[in-house]
Structure formats: C-alpha cells, structure tokens
From Swiss-Prot:
Keyword Metal-binding among UniProt keywords: no
Subunit description: Chlorophyllide reductase is composed of three subunits; BchX, BchY and BchZ. Forms a heterodimer of one BchY and one BchZ subunit.
Organism of origin: Erythrobacter longus
Descriptive protein name: Chlorophyllide reductase subunit Z
Encoding gene, per UniProt annotation: bchZ
Pfam families documented for this protein: Oxidored_nitro, PCP_red
Family matches, as PANTHER family: LIGHT-INDEPENDENT PROTOCHLOROPHYLLIDE REDUCTASE SUBUNIT B
Catalysed conversion reaction: 3-deacetyl-3-vinylbacteriochlorophyllide a + 2 oxidized [2Fe-2S]-[ferredoxin] + ADP + phosphate = chlorophyllide a + 2 reduced [2Fe-2S]-[ferredoxin] + ATP + H2O + H(+); bacteriochlorophyllide a + 2 oxidized [2Fe-2S]-[ferredoxin] + ADP + phosphate = 3-acetyl-3-devinylchlorophyllide a + 2 reduced [2Fe-2S]-[ferredoxin] + ATP + H2O + H(+); 3-deacetyl-3-(1-hydroxyethyl)bacteriochlorophyllide a + 2 oxidized [2Fe-2S]-[ferredoxin] + ADP + phosphate = 3-devinyl-3-(1-hydroxyethyl)chlorophyllide a + 2 reduced [2Fe-2S]-[ferredoxin] + ATP + H2O + H(+)
Pathway assigned to this chain's UniProt record: Porphyrin-containing compound metabolism; bacteriochlorophyll biosynthesis
Length: 494
C-alpha cells in the first residue's frame, strides 16, 4: 500500500457526477449518504465553478445505518427518484460506501439507468472518460452515421469534447477553442457534455472532426466516434500546428486567420517579451504542477517557445498515483520564482517561506474562473500566460525592494575596529560583529544557490542577518551551522 500525501484528485463518482450534471435533460441520483452530495456538489463546485446550491438536477438517497446494515439502498433510491421529474431520464451513480454494500440497484417501475463509477478503483478522470462514452452509447444512435459529403459553401462541423464541471479554467479555454475553430472557417457543432441536451447527443456522430479538450479524459469517446480528432493546444507553436492540422483535415486555409492573429491577439505577447522584464527571463525559473493538459502545455510553451528555465514539472495523469512527496521536496529544495500549481504547491511554498510568486493552474483549491478572459489554451492563452509571468516578476521585484518603514526599524550599521564600544540591541544582546565558520558559510552559499537568481541578493541578506542575530542572542562571536538552522526554523529567512 502506498500512502498518498495531500491527495490532488477526487474519486470516480465525482467525475461521473460532473459529466452527467453538465448534460441538459438528465437527472442524477447519488446513491450514498448526504455528504456524497454536499461535498462534491454543494460545497466544492461553489469554490471552483461558483455554482449556487441546488443549481443542478441532483438528488441523494441519503443512506443511513438502516440502509447500510439492514435494508439496502433500493427503497431509498425509489424515494429519491419520486422527488424528480418522472418524464425525464435519470442516472444513478454510486459512492464508495454504496459500492461496498452492492448499491446502485435500480428499483422496478422507474426510468433510472445505472452507471457504476468504480469510485474505489478509479479517479475522477478515468470515470469521467467512461461516463462520456456511456452517454453516447445510451443516448446516441444505435449505428454510427457515415460521413456525408458537404454541400457547396457549407462549413465543416467540429465538436468540442470534454468541457464539464470541476475542470480548472474551463470557461475561458472553451471560449478560446471555439474562437479558433470558428476563426479558420469551421462551425462548432456540439460542445459535450457541458450544455448539451440529451436529444443533441446523437449529433456527435455527424461532425467532420472533434477537438479533445483535455488529456485526462475524452479520448475514448473521440476514438468511438470514428472521426479525426485533435488535442486542444496550449502555447504558441502548438496552436499554430493545431490550426494547420485541423484546417488540412477540413479542407480550409488557416493562414489568413493566423496572420490576423499575429497582428492582434499575439501582438501583446511580443510587446511583453520586449518589455522591461526581458532582463530577467533567462534567469526567472518556473515550476508547474498541474493536470497533464496544462503541465505539459505550459512547460513546452514557456521553456521551449519562450526560453524560460523550468525548475521542475509534474503532470497529474488519469490513473497514475500522484508524487506529491517529490513535489514537496523539490519546492523545499529549489523554490522557483514563479510557481504554477494548486493549493498543495502553495502550501509547500509556505512551509519554507518561499518568496516565489504563485499562479493558480490546477485544482484542488478555491479558484473561480467563470469569466472567459483568463485562457491558458490557444493564442489568447499564450498572451495571457506571458502577461501573468511578467506581472509575477513585477510582484517579485516589489517584495525585493525594502520598505522605508523596515529600513527605519533596522539596527544601525556597526563600525569596525576594536575601539568601537559594544552596543545593546533591542533584545539586550550585544550587537558586536560576528564571524562565520567554514561550515556555516558553505551552507549559506548552498541555500542562496537554491534561490531564484532574481531574489538571491535579498535572500542572502535576510538569511545572513537572521543567522547573525541568532548568534548574537547566544552571545557568540561566530555564526555556526546551528545558528543558521535556527534562523531557518524560526522562518526569519528565505
């Protein structure tokens, strides 16, 4: 058994629930205790998608001791179903407790369909991947439609597969992918599952191509639809390749759109790149820990396209256990100047007092992105990401420069020489000059070397002052490795 530190994803029924509730005309029954709705839906979606309580067509069976130990879940499910619209189809998803007692059995005389999320075995993305295909199997046509020739002047149709609740930055990225598809002259058919009606699911099979929004889930459905599909791009070069490949498949010319984008959407990117922050780009390292879609895309864009050094990059992949112990160790050892990640990474930075700038790029964490002006994907996303990096550098510079009030509180600079009288500091300890032993000096150099280049000078000063203050507090004439360690433990430095 492997103990997972700070879990970064939910179980299977969360993913299935977020997919099913995104479809219009489908009601969802969660077979489990009341918390199985309160946590993933009422609580979490409020902090990630800004959804008010009871916004979605969900009911929970509310299993208690009676059902768990004696009667089973069937009667509770029938009571839950009776509160829904009997004319509309419903699907039941089972939480882990319900799965352990064999729950999810649909009562006779109802129109409830059953989907088994396998929440004990699968994470939210694995289950979401199966849920998308299940919707097509249950509500799509029995036979896959054959591709039909387009009429003269008719636009090719492209579906966007994957947008659903609980996905970081989804509204902005969906808007950008739609803009790109329409920009080259195609038409967006079905956005699935978000906002798609049950009756429109069958239209998925009539498109000329599909775009898979995320690497975590959606590809299984894209394969099932038997149409060419393309991965939604993150970054400059990836977006250009995406547009050209999609256009070639659809028989369109993307170059006029790409040329317009260079003078409009992408123009601020080059202006930002030539701005006053350009002096720091070669040394302003970044780290990223996020879903594979963003971790892979942002690293490729910032490191390969733009030349920023990458301190580390970790992808959260479907079905792969997280390595948060390694993430924590890397952040503690070499904190980057710009950290893209989730609440977990922000917490790890705070543990060591890291002064790098944090940019939300993943869940878990409270980060609402309902507005469509914060894309990571496409050309707009490339410009937005560089803008975020530039602003992070400005913010880092602000914290490097000392405040006037802090300078006023500082102790006077000591004069050198044996005849200078010893003065008492604010804590009563002598403020005489101290020396550094070899081990402490070597450790200081190591700690400073671990810091981003931009903040090394200020980090070295804070660390040196704190260690010397610790030595003086002991009445010592020499800063030892122990003094340095005390300063680190007290959080006075770096």
């Amino acid at each position: 058994m492997t103990l997972v530190l700070d879990h970064d994803r939910a179980g299977g029924y969360w993913g299935a629930t977020y997919v099913f509730t995104a479809v219009k005309g489908l009601q969802v029954i969660i077979d489990g205790p009341v918390g199985c709705e309160n946590l993933p839906v009422t609580s979490v979606l409020h902090y990630t998608d800004a959804l008010p309580p009871h916004e979605l067509p969900i009911v929970v069976t509310g299993l208690g001791e009676e059902e768990l130990g004696k009667t089973g879940t069937e009667a509770a499910m029938k009571r839950a179903w009776q509160t829904l619209d009997p004319e509309l189809p419903a699907v039941v998803v089972t939480g882990s407790i319900s799965e352990m007692i064999g729950g999810g059995v649909t009562p006779e005389g109802t129109n409830i369909k059953r989907f088994l999320p396998r929440t004990i075995d699968e994470d939210q993305w694995q289950s979401a991947d199966r849920a998308l295909t299940w919707l097509w199997t249950e509500f799509g046509p029995k036979k896959m439609p054959q591709p039909r020739p387009r009429k003269e002047g008719e636009k090719p149709v492209v579906n966007i597969i994957g947008p659903s609740y609980g996905m970081f930055n989804m509204p902005s990225d969906l808007a950008e992918i739609r803009r790109l598809v329409e920009g080259i002259g195609a038409e967006v058919g079905v956005v699935f599952p978000l906002g798609c009606h049950l009756a429109d699911i069958r239209k998925l099979g009539t498109a000329d191509a599909n775009v898979c929004m995320y690497r975590e889930f959606g590809r299984n459905l894209c394969e099932t639809l038997e149409r060419p599909y393309f991965q939604a791009p993150v970054g400059l070069s990836s977006t250009t390749k995406f547009l050209r490949a999609l256009a070639a498949e659809l028989g369109l010319d993307p170059e006029p759109f790409i040329e317009r984008e260079k003078h409009t959407t992408i123009k601020p990117l080059w202006d930002l790149w030539r701005s006053v922050t350009q002096d720091f780009f070669a040394t302003a390292n970044f780290g990223i820990v996020a879903n594979d879609t963003y971790a892979r895309g942002i690293r490729h864009f910032l490191e390969d396209d733009m030349g920023l050094p990458c301190a580390f990059a970790y992808s959260r992949e479907a079905g792969v256990k997280p390595r948060n112990d390694e993430v924590r160790e890397d952040i503690h050892k070499s904190p980057p100047l710009v950290m893209f990640g989730s609440y977990n990474e922000r917490m790890y930075m705070a543990e060591v007092g890291a002064r790098g700038k944090f940019i939300p790029a993943s869940f878990p964490g409270a980060a609402i992105r309902r507005h469509i002006g914060t894309p990571f994907m496409g050309y707009s996303g490339a410009t937005y990401l560089v803008q975020e990096v530039c602003n992070a550098l400005f913010d880092a510079l602000f914290h490097i420069l000392p405040l006037g009030t802090d300078m006023d509180k500082g102790q006077a600079t000591l004069a050198r020489g044996a005849d200078v009288p010893v003065k008492a500091g604010s804590n009563g300890a002598p403020t005489h000059e101290v020396t550094w032993d070899t081990e402490a000096k070597a450790r200081l150099d190591e700690l400073v070397e671990e810091q981003p280049v931009l903040i090394r000078i200020s980090a070295a000063k804070r660390l040196r002052d704190a260690a010397e203050a610790a030595a003086r507090a002991k009445g010592a004439d020499t800063v030892t490795k122990d003094c340095l360690q005390e300063a680190l433990l007290e959080g006075e430095a770096v």
